[in-house]
Structures are given as C-alpha cells and as structure tokens.
From Swiss-Prot:
This is Inositol-tetrakisphosphate 1-kinase 1. Changing residue 70 to A: Strongly reduced InsP6 kinase activity. Pfam families: Ins134_P3_kin (PF05770), Ins134_P3_kin_N (PF17927). Changing residue 189 to A: Strongly reduced InsP6 kinase activity. Kinase that can phosphorylate various inositol polyphosphate such as Ins(3,4,5,6)P4 or Ins(1,3,4)P3 and participates in phytic acid biosynthesis in developing seeds. Phosphorylates Ins(3,4,5,6)P4 at position 1 to form Ins(1,3,4,5,6)P5. This reaction is thought to have regulatory importance, since Ins(3,4,5,6)P4 is an inhibitor of plasma membrane Ca(2+)-activated Cl(-) channels, while Ins(1,3,4,5,6)P5 is not. Also phosphorylates Ins(1,3,4)P3 on O-5 and O-6 to form Ins(1,3,4,6)P4, an essential molecule in the hexakisphosphate (InsP6) pathway. Keywords: ATP-binding, Kinase, Magnesium, Metal-binding, Nucleotide-binding, Transferase. Expressed in the embryo of 15 day after pollination. Expressed in kernels at earlier stages but at very low levels. Expression in the embryo peaks at 15 days after pollination and then declines. No expression is detected from endosperm and vegetative tissues. It comes from Zea mays (Maize). ATP binds at residues 105, 155, 166, 187, 190, 213, 296-297, 299. It catalyses: 1D-myo-inositol 3,4,5,6-tetrakisphosphate + ATP = 1D-myo-inositol 1,3,4,5,6-pentakisphosphate + ADP + H(+); 1D-myo-inositol 1,3,4-trisphosphate + ATP = 1D-myo-inositol 1,3,4,5-tetrakisphosphate + ADP + H(+); 1D-myo-inositol 1,3,4-trisphosphate + ATP = 1D-myo-inositol 1,3,4,6-tetrakisphosphate + ADP + H(+); 1D-myo-inositol 1,2,3,4,5-pentakisphosphate + ATP = 3-diphospho-1D-myo-inositol 1,2,4,5-tetrakisphosphate + ADP. 1D-myo-inositol 6-phosphate binds at residues 28, 70, 161, 166, 198, 200, 280, 299, 303, 306. Mg(2+) 1 binds at residues 282, 297. Belongs to the ITPK1 family.
Length: 342
C-alpha cells in the first residue's frame, strides 16, 4: 500500500486527501507525456504530478505516494535502491531489473515464446524467425543464416530508446549484409498487409490501435531492390510507390483487429511474465496464415500520449496504485480487463 496521504490542516476542516505522483523522465519524454490535460485530470482526482529533481538525491525528495520513471544508468539504479530502502511502502513503476529484459531484442521476444496458448482461441501467436549476430564475421556464416529467408529486418541488439537503437534496415539480399554493423538481430520480414497493431498496456487496461506499417514485399520488389534500405521506424520505410498508390490498395480502416480476448490473453501473459505495468507491443498478422500473429517488438513506457484517451487511463492507473497493493490484481481476478480498439 502506498504511504499515507498528507496530514489534515490544524483548522479542523476536513479536506479530501491528496496524493503525490513523482515522475523521473528525460526532458523529451517529460514534454510528450506530462501534458496539461493529464495534469488536470489527475488533479481532479486528488493526485498531483510532481517532477523529480535529478540534481538531488531521490531518497531525500517527496513525500511521494507513487514513483514512475524512465531513466537509466548505474547512478539512477542506485538511487532507486536507496529510495526503496527508505520508503518501502511507495510503489516504484517499474522495477529496473524487469525493464532490463526489454533492452535486449532477443530476451525481449523470448518471453513471447514462453507464453501459454489458450486452447479456446482460433488465432495463434509467436515471433518471427530470427538470429543474433555479434560480429561482422558471423554475417558471412552461411550456416548461421540458413534458417532465414530474405528479405530480413536488421535491428540493433540493444534497444535502449536512443536514436541509434531505432536505426534499422530492410535487407533484400545477402549482398546487403555487408553494410550492417553488429551486434544486431536479423529477423525475417513477414508480409502483413502494411498494417501493424500497437497494443498499449497500462496495468490491467489494454488498448489496441491500428497503424500503417511497411508495405508488403513482392517478388518483383525483391528482385529489383538494392541490397538494403535503412529506416528508423516501421512506418517510414522509403518506397518507390507513393503512399496514395500503396495505401489506395489496402485501406487501414479495412484491417480487421484481432479478437479482444486474444489480445487480452497476450497482454496479460506478457504483463505477468515481464513483471511490468507500463509497456506496449507491436504485432502483425502473417498474410500467409490469416489467423497467425507475430509479436515483433516490446517497448517500456511508450508514447502514451498517442493512445486515445490516455489521460483517463493513466489517471485510473495512478489512482489504483496509490490505493492498493499491485494494480490490476483485483481486476484480473474479476475479469475486468478489457480491450479498447481504435
């Protein structure tokens, strides 16, 4: 349970308790996440969002009733340990050791393979075939890549949120491997109709939104393409076809969202396995098997401001965290988890 609310004033007048939500975020993250609309909605529920002063020891700040963060480094980890020792009743979202698993693109997706599949679901899920490459010499190892089919997506092994970790390449042929800089992950590119499903998880709440993604690669594209093409996001790959030409063929609105129970199954399984409250995952539908879905990425504390109605969802989450041990436990037991599709 979070620490007690501030004491009532000595005048004897009863005021509703207020709770302090401390946030430790990088400037860019703070600018995108701490919107006036979120601050106002939290305040209307008796919760004040207060920034952590990174220049001062964390353990000496507060009092906080909940701490959310997305900072990294040994010093910050040590500060969290000191804070937890001094304020053991204050929830910290999320534990650094749990976040660490998402910094490696192999361990990140390995957890998906470990999830149980519900017997009553027609749809199935998994991850694309992939291998990790630690050095340039391995790129010439035909045996290592024998199990993969081109084209491939090359992603940096480390996923720490930096610009470098977002730099990816679509590799059409083996010749394109020479431009890559290990360590990296080579993942089979799977045609998915140019649509990606972004699933946001906030405690027990799940929201799925549709976004445009990489265009499918046809045999003609594959034969005429250069060795590799670099890009930073799955939604901005350069292509000779204009957006109107490609997306005129396949409408985002026509894409069918996976069943809510299916999405909730994966989201809940990941939440329990990862031990995280704030994350999202990207999922695609394999066009070769319409009821087969592949999780291709998992991100900690994503850009929630892009999620419809994020202010209400996050405010509810904060409220639950300061009022009971472990947000979402009661929800899952009562089957109150739900998926909002946008």
């Amino acid at each position: 349970m979070a620490s007690d609310a501030a004491a009532e004033p000595s005048s004897g007048v009863t005021h509703p308790p207020r709770y302090v939500i401390g946030y430790a975020l990088a400037p860019k993250k703070q600018q995108s996440f701490i919107q006036p609309s979120l601050v106002a909605q939290a305040a209307s529920r008796g919760m004040d969002l207060v920034p952590v002063d990174a220049s001062q020891p964390l353990a000496e700040q507060g009092p906080f009733h909940l701490l959310i963060h997305k900072l990294y480094g040994d010093d910050w980890r040590a500060q969290l340990v000191a804070f937890a020792a001094r304020h053991p009743a204050v929830p910290i979202v999320d534990p650094p050791h749990a976040i660490d698993r998402l910094h490696n693109r192999i361990s990140m997706l390995q957890v998906v393979s470990e999830l149980d599949h519900a017997a009553d679901q027609d749809s199935t899920f998994g991850i694309p075939s992939q291998v990790v490459v630690y050095d340039a010499a391995a790129l010439a190892d035909f045996g290592l890549l024998a199990a993969l089919r081109f084209p491939l997506i090359a992603k940096p092994l480390v996923a720490d949120g930096t610009a470098k970790s977002h730099k990816m390449s679509l590799v059409y042929h083996r010749e394109g491997l020479g431009k890559l800089r290990p360590p990296l992950v080579l993942q089979e590119f799977v045609n998915h109709g140019g649509v990606i499903f972004k699933v946001y998880v906030v405690g027990g709440h799940v929201t799925c939104v549709k976004r445009r993604s990489l265009p499918d690669v046809s045999p003609e594209d594959d034969a005429s393409a250069q060795g590799s093409v670099s890009f930073s996001q799955v939604s901005n790959l350069p292509t000779e076809r204009t957006a109107e030409e490609y997306y005129g063929e396949k409408s985002l609105e026509d894409a069918v969202v996976p069943p809510a129970a299916f999405i909730n199954q994966i989201a809940g399984g990941l939440r329990r396995a990862l031990g995280l409250q704030l994350f999202n995952f990207d999922m695609i539908r394999d066009v070769r098997a319409g009821d087969r879905y592949l999780v291709i990425d998992i991100n900690y504390f994503p850009g929630y401001a892009k999620m419809p109605g994020y202010e209400t969802v996050l405010t509810d989450f904060f409220w639950e965290m300061v009022h009971k041990d472990g947000v979402g436990n009661q929800q899952e037991e009562k089957g109150a988890n739900h998926v909002v599709v946008k």
